[in-house]
């Protein structure tokens, strides 16, 4: 079987971290004997420069036909038109592909716990995933307005929107340590009451998964004081936005964190959580590990290459443990040197 992969290098450091990652993918495919077809398209700010839009119809159609999308990074101060920003392309892509679930792993190995801003004995062994609903909730609710003396946002969820994200979280927990924490604000919000009800209903289909309901304020505290208690966390859009950013600092650098966006079926999108960092673009300083770990997610979730994903993750964590890192992690290695060493593991 041959997989179709679309590469979207994007802006800033995106092209340099993705190009090295694609070279790794080629070596991994040769070792693990799978085939893929690769297409690359301009996306984000660079697409605005070339075509006047952050997402062309050709690029969108290519993405719709893909098994997986690998995205570098988008955005930067160069593109200031509020009606034609690079980020609009990503929002349109997510909506067109119905990517309603954002998956963000947070992992701290014994050898990397010293990088965390938290105490080592607190973070060591952290291995959690936050599943965030991505396309509904207060960010998309109507009516929404700002007037001179008042403003309104609307928080709305349907049972179908809740159930589909909850099932993705249950399936993920079922493959991991079988612990699911559902985060809401059930003591105050009507939408959270429905959320909790749906979680309890869906639980009947997953008898082996232990479910714990937690209020969002309590969860935000426990993420800092006892992150190792969590396996899979599922929550709505606003809470997930905040909690996933909070969790992302636990490993010690935004450059370490991968992410994925899933729909019910079809194409899945993989990207590091960091921005385009235009201040260090083309300076060979970018931390590539978030992009490389996003490839590992892609190998596992879209290409059915679990062994390859596990090996790649182990190699990255061994590099961190031995301080083969870029400056943001306290190392002295350039981006190109990291990729050279990574590729040598497959030669």
UniProtKB/Swiss-Prot annotation:
Give UniProt keywords alphabetically: Amino-acid biosynthesis, Branched-chain amino acid biosynthesis, Cytoplasm, Leucine biosynthesis, Magnesium, Manganese, Metal-binding, NAD, Oxidoreductase
Binding, substrate: 94, 104, 132, 217
Q: Say yes or no: keyword Nucleotidyltransferase present.
A: no
The record's listing under Pfam families reads: Iso_dh (PF00180)
| Chain positions of site Important for catalysis | 139, 185
Q: Does the keyword Chloroplast apply?
A: no
Q: What is its EC number?
A: 1.1.1.85
Residue positions binding Mg(2+): 217, 241, 245
Name the positions where NAD(+) binds.
Answer: 76-87, 275-287
Where does this polypeptide localize?
A: Cytoplasm
Q: Name one GO molecular function term.
A: NAD binding
Which SMART domains did the record assign?
Answer: Iso_dh
Q: What is the catalytic activity of this protein? A: (2R,3S)-3-isopropylmalate + NAD(+) = 4-methyl-2-oxopentanoate + CO2 + NADH
GO cellular component, alphabetical, reads: cytosol
Q: What does the entry's cofactor note say about binding and number?
A: Binds 1 Mg(2+) or Mn(2+) ion per subunit.
Superkingdom field: Bacteria
How this chain assembles, per its entry, is: Homodimer.
Q: Which family does it belong to?
A: Belongs to the isocitrate and isopropylmalate dehydrogenases family. LeuB type 1 subfamily.
Question: What job does this protein perform?
Answer: Catalyzes the oxidation of 3-carboxy-2-hydroxy-4-methylpentanoate (3-isopropylmalate) to 3-carboxy-4-methyl-2-oxopentanoate. The product decarboxylates to 4-methyl-2 oxopentanoate.
- Cite the PANTHER family for this sequence: 3-ISOPROPYLMALATE DEHYDROGENASE
Q: What is this protein called?
A: 3-isopropylmalate dehydrogenase
Source organism per UniProt: Staphylococcus epidermidis (strain ATCC 12228 / FDA PCI 1200)
State the taxonomy lineage. Bacteria, Bacillati, Bacillota, Bacilli, Bacillales
